[in-house]
């Protein structure tokens, strides 16, 4: 059942001649490191390609260690965005991107046993952790914890003024 579910959420892209295969959220034709790393927890048991997404995020990592949230080759905002391009996005409020990159690398290594692969990736992983632990937007020096801004996006906000019960509910069963 898990295998069938995840198989429907695989996206294959070719960027600069490199084949990239990864898990995606069903609502977007893009590969988010967040979704991919979470889905790898189940997919690592049967997915044949666990490294190409990690390699691509490593390849596109900024010199300071920042990692993109997602990439896509499909237009997202029609009709203004056109095809035949590759888009990389970092959502500034997200504070979990770098650790999810490290988590994805760990899960890929755990499943494949690619010791040389993970060894070669270590400088990128260290750089990602250094970035998140030293950036004033994401690191609370006093508490020694990652912090994130409170925003109305990414599931933080559900204000209905009591008018829409369906907008804010909890499943108890």
Where are these regions (language model features)?
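Alpha-solenoid repeat scaffolds
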Residues: 50, 63-64, 73, 77, ...
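The feature captures the catalytic groove of carbohydrate-active enzymes
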Residues: 25, 70-100, 133-173
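The substrate-binding groove and active-site-proximal loops of carbohydrate-active enzymes
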Residues: 33, 85-91, 109-119
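Extended, well-ordered alpha-helical scaffold segments
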Residues: 1-5, 48-60, 114-135
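Generic hydrophobic/packing signal
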Residues: 61, 71, 75, 105-113, ...
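Low-complexity, Ser/Thr/Pro/Gly-enriched N-terminal "stalk/linker" regions
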Residues: 1-31, 51-52, 56, 66
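Well-ordered alpha-helical scaffold segments within catalytic/enzyme domains
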Residues: 36-49, 100-117, 173
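Alpha-solenoid helical-repeat scaffolds
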Residues: 30-33, 95
């Amino acid at each position: 059942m898990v295998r069938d579910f995840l198989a429907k959420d695989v996206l294959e892209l070719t960027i600069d001649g490199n084949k990239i295969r990864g898990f995606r959220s069903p609502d977007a034709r893009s590969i988010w490191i967040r979704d991919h790393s979470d889905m790898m927890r189940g997919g690592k048991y049967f997915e044949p390609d666990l490294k190409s997404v990690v390699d691509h995020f490593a390849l596109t990592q900024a010199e300071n260690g920042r990692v993109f949230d997602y990439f896509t080759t499909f237009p997202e905002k029609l009709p203004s965005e056109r095809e035949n391009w590759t888009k990389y996005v970092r959502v500034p409020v997200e504070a979990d991107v770098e650790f999810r990159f490290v988590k994805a690398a760990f899960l890929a290594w755990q499943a494949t046993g690619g010791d040389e692969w993970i060894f070669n990736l270590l400088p990128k992983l260290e750089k990602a952790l250094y970035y998140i632990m030293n950036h004033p937007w994401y690191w609370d020096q006093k508490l020694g914890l990652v912090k994130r801004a409170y925003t109305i996006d990414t599931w933080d906000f559900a204000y209905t003024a009591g008018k829409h019960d369906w907008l804010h509910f909890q499943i108890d069963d």
